């Protein structure tokens, strides 16, 4: 078919011989390729296709003479085209089979990357073929346009031929030699049959060279491919090896780590096992000891029981003997009676006239016996009952009424009956029961009987005289009783208006007698579970608590949130004891566990322990009202509000009621247990809520907490929301527990070893010394940085205790509690204390203590002595800061006094005038009471703390960097004097200038500033010193009595108490009723009514002899002045310190003013009361007190 096609083309162009020769050479080449593989024949096929394309592109000549021949040839060509199409289909099938075989072999050798390359090559070849087919079709179209007579069929045939040749070009893969030879032989046979035999002789040398080049190129490509493949394989193998190495290394590391962990775990297990064994041994030893103790106790009990039995047996024997003797005596008496009766009968028979005389005598005698037999306590009881109506007055000693009067009172009804009936009854009694004397006389002899008759006559005369005397005494005693009743009524009225020197009783001597009898048993209202132990029991408890293991004994695992139940149980243990040492030990153990297992929860635990949700100066408080809590409790438990209120009146503690209440509502699922984190965050949310809808949201949050509570959690959740935990824990105790926890279980140091209990490595004395040192460091550091969020991380860091004073220093914007002064009894005492020391005297201004903070960005804050933010109360001070601050000052902390000041007269006004200013949202345009700042100390300046510098240098910094401004800012007036007369005159000058007195301070030695401490390096001499007492007291009203007379409708007298910081309780100090104006009585009554409570709080300590009409929850502080202090069996302030059974009381107290700048916990402490009492003894200038003054 190929030869015919080539011949047709050559004839049409002129029958050129060269074309025929080429055709023959091509045929010969095909002949040779029968035995060659298919890849070698590709080059020949390519050359043929290129030559054919060149020929097709040449222009064709026209010949009109050969039209018929052309038509015949066209018909033949059509037939040939059909045959060629069939052959092409066969070739295509064969080619596809060959490609599949070759691809299968290549896939075994090549990787996936080479397959993708082959695919890309095939696609590129196909695209090239498509382009070539398009170019050939375009060339054919040009030829058809030139040839007018040639039909379109010829062009299609040519294109088909070209396609067939190009498809052969696509045979890229090798097939088996046998299959390829067969297909090639068939093709070559067809070509050689049509051509002449001469074609076999001529083969051009050019074709051979071309073939060799093609083969070489292919070989090169194959070599390159193989080399690439080898390189890629090697690279892959290298990567695999590297990966395997890395994996091995990682496995080795993991195995090592696992081994190390296993070793550590083994060590821990061994340690635990050792500890367990030790514990088991200890437990066994304890059990043995307990068994021995029990056996001893049993033996002792048995011995005691034996002794008791023996005693009982002895007693029984004695009783039996006594009974026998009594029986014998009774029998004797009966016999004697019988004999006597016989003798009497005989007498009656012998002497009938004397019968009337005997009966009357016996009547009178029986009447006298009846009078004497009446108990003598009836009138006494009636009088004592009357006396008990007096307000805890000791009963006056009275004479005992005569037995005759008592007998007459009991027998008046019987004497009104007829004498005959009584005479007969009495005579029968007298006959049946004669006196023992007469019986003896009858038994002895008849002479004695006659003697008895004489004695009876004498007794009759005596009884008559006694009856007359008794009648007179009866009348006198009745008059005395009436007078005494009148006196008691008068005393009741007078005692309510005027009490004695102790505030309650009238006579000190009688009180002391009564106190010696009663021994003044004070009642401290504490929970039932509260225990008080002696020193031995406390030490035993401390030893048991000291064996606490912070990890093993904890109820949660490392990294977990601390359950709130752990804190609640700790509170419960602390509430069950009154020992401060045990309380600190319990809290320190909890802190140790939290530091080791969940250190993030430590700060929140501290805040919950002191019943706060943040630093004091942030003024975030819970203080939820009782009404809201009752509603929340009712809704969460399904109980009614009225029932809860009724129980509250009986119990007095809403927390106990909540703990005992069980929810009757069904829940969809179990609530999640409370954690310290969840409780603390909920408390913060409650404190932040305000405005419309705030109360309802608060109730919802409280209900969620209560629903999740278990066991004792409810008790302390409710108390925390009320703001009163009542567990006897002061903030100082919390700091001591923190110090102990860090000392006993210190953080891991550079060595990487964790010490769980350092006490095992130290002696007890050494540990105590170090503990006291750590406590002093911790308390001082916290006084400089009173923010647990900042303080605790420094404390629990590595070497935190050693560096705590340097890391926790003053910071602007964080207020510190001010340094306070000790009161003195006079100038002489002050001079004795400051002998051989330089000191200075400052005016003590009557205002409000203020601490001004100026930040580098220009903002100003003002804080009170309680660390409350009063910036809104004093906007005038904030506005005037720029007037008194020097140009070089960027930041400072100023200690000063804000004093009410009259700018017109330039005089200081009293504190009462200052207290009329509003506390919140004060606007400059509305200020009616202007304020002047009197500065006396500088604590911080331009980024540096000055508290460790002496006062003389701090004062220099103050004067150099601040500017005095009239009516706005002034320096506290001072003088460095030492003469007694000069000090006295300077004190008088201060009093004349409306100041409270003088502040005397050390100037150089021991003159550092000590925050939150009452120091003896500062002493105060107040103007009250000249009037008698050294200093006033700040006390809290906790009870009141209703007024009478002019004071009806108000409270006439109040019960005041001081605050004991160690036990967190209020101790009574006096009953006060003087110093109040009528307006003050009405205002105080209205102000205190919202704070009424049904029962005294657990934190109140009072005597059972004090019973006010109403009780108050602590809400305000009053300044009180008194004549002096005395030991009292009635009041409980500092009880047990100066006297084991008595406290301290104020004599003649009087009200001075309200102290709005102080909270109840900032009231005068019991320790201060003791100091004032001791200083009072030293004071030689004690005032003389008028005995007629009221004791209020």
Swiss-Prot record:
Ranges for region Interaction with target DNA: 724-733, 918-920
Biological role: DNA ligase that seals nicks in double-stranded DNA during DNA replication, DNA recombination and DNA repair.
Site residues (Interaction with target DNA), renumbered to this chain: 580, 866, 1046, 1071
Needed co-factor(s): Mg(2+)
Annotated gene: lig1
Protein's name according to its UniProt entry: DNA ligase 1
Main location: nucleus
Presence of keyword Cell division: yes
Active-site positions on this chain: 844 (n6-amp-lysine intermediate)
EC number(s) from the headed UniProt entry: 6.5.1.1
Reaction it catalyzes: ATP + (deoxyribonucleotide)n-3'-hydroxyl + 5'-phospho-(deoxyribonucleotide)m = (deoxyribonucleotide)n+m + AMP + diphosphate
Enzyme superclass (EC): ligase
Keywords per UniProt: ATP-binding, Cell cycle, Cell division, DNA damage, DNA recombination, DNA repair, DNA replication, Ligase, Magnesium, Metal-binding, Nucleotide-binding, Nucleus
Low complexity composition bias: residue spans: 371-382, 410-434
Organismal lineage: Eukaryota, Amoebozoa, Evosea, Eumycetozoa, Dictyostelia
Biased composition (Acidic residues): 70-113, 172-198, 468-511
Keyword set includes Ligase: yes
Binding site for Mg(2+) 2: 996
Location(s), subcellular: Nucleus
Molecular-function annotations in GO: ATP binding; DNA binding; DNA ligase (ATP) activity; metal ion binding
GO BP: any one term: DNA repair
GO CC annotations on file: nucleus
NCBIfam families: dnl1
Binding site for Mg(2+) 1: 897
Gene3D superfamilies listed in its UniProt record: 3.30.1490.70, DNA ligase, ATP-dependent, N-terminal domain, DNA ligase/mRNA capping enzyme, Nucleic acid-binding proteins
